[in-house]
Amino acid sequence: LIDMFQRLPGRRLWPRTKISSLVAMLALSMLGAVLPVVSATPAAAAAAVAGPAGDDFYTPPSPLPAGNPGDVIWYRKQADSGNASSYLVLYHSRDALGQPNAVSGTILVPKGRSPVGMPIVSLGSGTVGLGDQCAPSKNSLVSVAQNQGFIDKALQRGFAVAMTDYEGLGTPGVHTYVIGRSEGHAVLDVVRAAQRLPETGLSTANPVGLLGYSQGGGAAAWAGELQPTYAPELNLKAISAGGIPADLLAVSQQLDGGLGFAVLAMAALGLDSAYPELDLESYLNASGKKFFTDFSDDCVESLTIYPFRKLSDYTTINPLTTAAWKARINEQKLGAVAPKVPTFMYHAWPIDELVARPQGVALKDTYCAAGSPIRWKDYLGDHATVIFTSQSDAVSFLADRFANVPFSRSC
């Protein structure tokens, strides 16, 4: 597997030790807040505007033009990805506070197949980092490593794939990492963008599945909870979500002082970006100000140099212990809206070193108690290896639901 990553086409050769560390840190997603949202009225597909060349594509017009969530601001036709047409899109979405924003993403449509009735899989990427250069649409090494298997398996089955970059990855601003409402909106709105880009031939009639692991698993789960009120017009059929960080407080206890400290630091920056009143900088000591400044544009492969540190190393007061931070964190706990569509949930077993297993099981139990159609599976391995060992099952689960194969609940 490491050899395969080293030899990805068109990429420089990475040292084996670097790749090993990278894979060990592929991580996380956590939160969001389920708040009532007024859904946008679906718009008919209109002629799309071609976006600017280069990285200027990712900078939206200022002021942001009016638009409903999922409306395409502009797009770019890219080189085909295998046997799929590829489009880069900048689209309207909503942030954690419900305010309009612009998010980038990628849409892949298999060639040689009718788009009529073609399933659309919205893939939430796992953790890639905070820097704009890490965005999934820019094909960073870590994004390709963890997402390409999902993409290939979906395309081989004839499914279109829509993958968001999330808020603040590629686009201006700090990535709102781990903020479930922001990520859930982005995951749903990239499907709308795929349906509204005339070049794809897709529409609201196409069945939709949500897919992701780690940060992507959390994003998919949040999209599932938000969909009934935020995007009710989507023909949602199923969800496959693994390694879900459903309870940030529970996850943070394992990360602070542990192998995944960098992920906790990313979460702190994500919360601060989504909720400016939290004012992370006011809690930082001199070391913390330097650390978070240097850290804020890293990709995940460079984050492996920060294990076993603690927030107390960088703060005068640990913000996670304050009332303001606790209130926002408590808003982020998954489980308030149980999914009504078949949902495949899975986790590393017996121990997940990055996303604590007990809180994932607790979310499953919450959904099951509410009567949700859940299928649960344990995968022997750690957080990183389960990314790869689970991919076939996760995509197959969606395929079976698209094909109306009978579903058996396994709570």
Predicted regions and their residues:
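Catalytic-loop region of hydrolases
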Residues: 43-114
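Accessory cap/linker subdomain of secreted extracellular hydrolases
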Residues: 242-336
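Acidic catalytic loop of the alpha/beta-hydrolase fold
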Residues: 349-358, 384
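Short beta-strand/loop motif that positions the catalytic acidic residue
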Residues: 339, 344-348, 352
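Secretory targeting and sorting signals
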Residues: 2-45
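Primarily recognizes the serine-hydrolase "nucleophile elbow" in alpha/beta-hydrolase
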Residues: 192-262
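Alpha/beta-hydrolase active-site loop
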Residues: 150, 177-199
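Short, surface-exposed "cap/lid" segments of acyl-processing enzymes
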Residues: 95-156
